[in-house]
Amino acid sequence: MKLYESGEDYLEAVLMLQKKNGMVRSVDLARHMGFSKPSISHAVGVLKNGGFLTVDDGFLHLTVIGREIAEKIYERHLFFMEQLIVAGVDQEIAEQD
């Protein structure tokens, strides 16, 4: 299954929330990303069907491939954030971009 940028964003967000909170629910993801619960439910379903996520007792878990992709996206995000900060962009803005 082809993973689009939005799917990558969801996987990265799940990874970040797991690192921060340990366990992640759909409602946590909705709050973090600023999306509606139905939008998150749809995306979770697509990612689950693609083999990137599993859901167990209401908690989201990255599969091996989902985690690999999320880690790559997160590393890329950190690299570009650092480049923006070095270029003089405020850290808060660099994190958002």
What are these regions (language model features)?
Residues 32, 49-50, 86:
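Residues at alpha-helix termini
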Residues 58-76:
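Basic, amphipathic "hinge/linker" alpha-helix immediately C-terminal to the N-terminal HTH DNA-binding motif
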Residues 20-22, 75, 86:
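Helix-turn-helix/winged-helix DNA-binding modules
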Residues 78-97:
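Amphipathic alpha-helical dimerization/coiled-coil segments
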Residues 48-58:
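A short, conserved structural fragment
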Residues 10, 29, 40-48:
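Basic amphipathic alpha-helical segments that dock to polyanions
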Residues 14, 51, 88:
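Conserved functional loop/turn residues at catalytic and ligand-binding sites
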Residues 2-35:
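N-terminal helix-turn-helix DNA-binding core of bacterial DNA-binding proteins
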